[in-house]
Swiss-Prot record:
Found at the monomer-monomer interface of the photosystem II (PS II) dimer, plays a role in assembly and dimerization of PSII. PSII is a light-driven water plastoquinone oxidoreductase, using light energy to abstract electrons from H(2)O, generating a proton gradient subsequently used for ATP formation. It is found in: Cellular thylakoid membrane. GO terms for cellular component: photosystem II reaction center; plasma membrane-derived thylakoid membrane. Pfam families: PsbT. Belongs to the PsbT family. HAMAP family: PSII_PsbT (MF_00808). Keywords: Membrane, Photosynthesis, Photosystem II, Thylakoid, Transmembrane, Transmembrane helix. This is Photosystem II reaction center protein T. PSII is composed of 1 copy each of membrane proteins PsbA, PsbB, PsbC, PsbD, PsbE, PsbF, PsbH, PsbI, PsbJ, PsbK, PsbL, PsbM, PsbT, PsbX, PsbY, PsbZ, Psb30/Ycf12, peripheral proteins PsbO, CyanoQ (PsbQ), PsbU, PsbV and a large number of cofactors. It forms dimeric complexes. InterPro entries: PSII_PsbT, PSII_PsbT_sf. The keyword Transmembrane helix applies.
């Protein structure tokens, strides 16, 4: 189950980076 935990941590890291970039830049898509 180490691989599952590694994938989970990697996904969390990518999501944190994605949200950091998304909130840093102004929203280009207005709904």
């Amino acid at each position: 189950m180490e691989s599952v935990a590694y994938i989970l941590v990697l996904t969390m890291a990518l999501s944190v980076i994605f949200f950091a970039i998304a909130f840093r830049e102004p929203p280009r898509i207005q709904k």
